[in-house]
């Protein structure tokens, strides 16, 4: 009797100890991962997300950084630095070349990231959010005398070295230009054509006129010279100093001056180009008494438009500048009865000629073909 009771106790104890092993592999792995990543203090007690909000008065140079930089930062952090400088100054941020956080998911920084926001009395604007290791964030200058930096890490993966941001203030603050732009008449000459360069005094230049003028320029330098001949070099330097105010989810990567020039050149080079076009063979060859297999073929034909690369684009058409004929082998059928055996006289492999456009030109009525 005592042996039977002892056996029952052993069976029950063994079953109770291992009943958790019947959980699904997925739930077991998730549970183990979460338990392994719970934040604990020095006494091994579980703690919540660590939060800290710090105000910094910017009177010179300094820096903020992720904890333990340049080593791996801790998990479960939410740190905020609010930087303030004196009136009529701005704050400039520069990231250390050592930068690395947890990688993005589908190009979105969801988990570990550092974020910079412009702060004013009326609004808060996100200047950028960064993570991963591929890109060192660019230099940032605040729009006002306040800026906010936020660092967040979740309870899973961490990375190193983290980040370090150097801050300083910029003197001689000038308010941003008003939304209503005026224009000052300044004459400059490009390609023998005179234009009025926009500044801040004359309100006669319309958007259509400005758009037409911009079509003349091939480089960013020429465009900025047109806007402000006296200060275009400073404008060029400042143009690539600040990041955009808002980055959408589909943001690609910041373009340099060379990239912008290349994009503009690509538009002019490829807007009117030969491209694949499918043609119906009966319609193309104007044959009504035959059919072909395949019914359609791909040929190179001019396509696109001239609207972004030339002046007076409304009078321009994209036309072939060089046409060649190429042979294609197809199966041709002619109406009639088909024999089930033997050679059918009304079916044969034939060579046909189709026009292919090798070069395309923008033909404008206001000027001869280029």
Swiss-Prot record:
Q: Give the CC-aspect GO terms.
A: extracellular space; membrane
Q: What is its main location?
A: secreted
State if Metal-binding is listed as a keyword. no
Please outline how this chain is modified post-translation: Activated by proteolytic cleavage. Proteolytic removal of the N-terminal CUB domain releasing the core domain is necessary for unmasking the receptor-binding epitopes of the core domain. Cleavage after Arg-247 or Arg-249 by urokinase plasminogen activator gives rise to the active form.
Keyword vocabulary terms for this entry: Cleavage on pair of basic residues, Developmental protein, Disulfide bond, Glycoprotein, Growth factor, Mitogen, Secreted, Signal
InterPro entries named among the record's database cross-references: CUB_dom, Cystine-knot_cytokine, PDGF/VEGF_dom, Sperma_CUB_dom_sf
**CDD domains tied to this protein:** CUB (cd00041), PDGF (cd00135)
User: In the record, which residues are listed under signal peptide?
Assistant: 1-23
Which residues are reported to be glycosylated?
276
A GO biological-process term: positive regulation of smooth muscle cell proliferation
Q: Name one Pfam family in it.
A: PDGF
SMART domains per the record? CUB (SM00042), PDGF (SM00141)
Expressing tissues: Widely expressed. Expressed at high levels in the kidney, adrenal glands, eye and CNS. In the kidney the localization is confined to arterial and arteriolar vascular smooth muscle cells and is also detected at low levels in the glomeruli In the eye in the anterior segment it is localized to the iris and ciliary body. In the retina localizes intensely to the outer plexiform layer, which contains photoreceptor axons and the synaptic layer between photoreceptors and second order neurons. In the spinal cord, prominently expressed in the motorneurons.
Which compartment or compartments is the protein found in? Secreted
Disulphide linkage map: 109-131, 302-360, 306-362
Q: Where is this site: Cleavage?
A: 247-250
Query: Which positions are tagged coiled coil?
Result: none
Any one GO MF annotation of this record: growth factor activity
Query: Which positions fall inside the CUB domain?
Result: 52-170
Q: Spell out the subunit comment.
A: Homodimer; disulfide-linked. Interacts with PDGFRB homodimers, and with heterodimers formed by PDGFRA and PDGFRB.
Write out the similarity annotation.
Answer: Belongs to the PDGF/VEGF growth factor family.
Q: What role is this protein assigned?
A: Growth factor that plays an essential role in the regulation of embryonic development, cell proliferation, cell migration, survival and chemotaxis. Potent mitogen for cells of mesenchymal origin. Plays an important role in wound healing. Induces macrophage recruitment, increased interstitial pressure, and blood vessel maturation during angiogenesis. May play an important role in control of lens epithelial cell proliferation. Can initiate events that lead to a mesangial proliferative glomerulonephritis, including influx of monocytes and macrophages and production of extracellular matrix.
Query: Which PANTHER family does the UniProt record give?
Result: PLATELET-DERIVED GROWTH FACTOR, PLATELET-DERIVED GROWTH FACTOR D
Q: What is this protein called?
A: Platelet-derived growth factor D
Species the sequence originates in: Rattus norvegicus (Rat)
């Amino acid at each position: 009797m005592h042996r039977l009771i002892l056996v029952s106790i052993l069976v029950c104890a063994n079953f109770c100890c291992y009943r958790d092993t019947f959980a699904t592999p997925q739930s077991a792995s998730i549970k183990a991962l979460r338990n392994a990543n719970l934040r604990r203090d020095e006494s091994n007690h579980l703690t919540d997300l660590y939060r800290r909000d710090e105000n910094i008065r910017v009177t010179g140079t300094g820096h903020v950084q992720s904890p333990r930089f340049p080593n791996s930062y801790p998990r479960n952090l939410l740190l905020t630095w609010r930087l303030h400088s004196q009136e009529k100054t701005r704050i400039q941020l520069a990231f250390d070349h050592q930068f690395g956080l947890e990688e993005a998911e589908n190009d979105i920084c969801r988990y570990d990231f550092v974020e910079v926001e412009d702060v004013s009395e009326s609004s808060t604007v996100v200047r950028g959010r960064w993570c991963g290791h591929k890109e060192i964030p660019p230099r940032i200058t605040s729009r006002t005398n306040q800026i906010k930096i936020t660092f967040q890490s979740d309870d899973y993966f961490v990375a190193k070295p983290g980040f370090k941001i150097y801050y300083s203030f910029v003197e001689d603050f000038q308010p941003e230009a008003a939304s209503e732009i005026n224009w000052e008449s300044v004459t400059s000459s490009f390609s023998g054509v005179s234009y009025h360069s926009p500044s801040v005094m004359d309100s006669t230049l319309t958007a259509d006129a400005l758009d037409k003028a911009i079509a003349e320029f091939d480089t960013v330098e020429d465009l900025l010279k047109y806007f402000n001949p006296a200060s275009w070099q400073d404008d060029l330097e400042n143009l690539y100093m600040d990041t955009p105010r808002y980055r959408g989810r589909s943001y690609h990567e910041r373009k340099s001056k060379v990239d912008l020039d290349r994009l503009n050149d690509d538009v002019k080079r490829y807007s009117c180009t030969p491209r694949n076009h499918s043609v119906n063979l009966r319609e193309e060859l104007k044959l009504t008494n035959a059919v072909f297999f395949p019914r359609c073929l791909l040929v190179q034909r001019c396509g696109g438009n001239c609207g972004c690369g030339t002046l007076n684009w409304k009078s321009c058409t994209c036309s072939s500048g060089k046409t060649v004929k190429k042979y294609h082998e197809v199966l041709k059928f002619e109406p009639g009865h088909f024999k089930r055996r033997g050679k059918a006289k009304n079916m044969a492999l034939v060579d046909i000629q189709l026009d292919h456009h090798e070069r395309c030109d923008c033909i404008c009525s206001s000027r001869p073909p280029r």
